[in-house]
């Protein structure tokens, strides 16, 4: 179903966003 598909996409984007945010945080800490 479309709702299930969108929920899956949302979960994937949230997972990717978390990884990117963690990496960005590490870069900021390393730059200080």
From Swiss-Prot:
The modification Glutamine amide is found at residue 32. Belongs to the frog skin active peptide (FSAP) family. Dermatoxin subfamily. Keywords: Amidation, Amphibian defense peptide, Antimicrobial, Secreted. It is found in: Secreted. Antimicrobial peptide. Its main location: secreted. GO terms for cellular component: extracellular region. Expressed by the skin glands. One of its GO terms (biological process) is defense response. Coiled coil: none annotated. This is Dermatoxin-J1.
């Amino acid at each position: 179903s479309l709702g299930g598909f969108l929920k899956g996409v949302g979960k994937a984007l949230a997972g990717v966003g978390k990884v990117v945010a963690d990496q960005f945080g590490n870069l900021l800490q390393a730059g200080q």
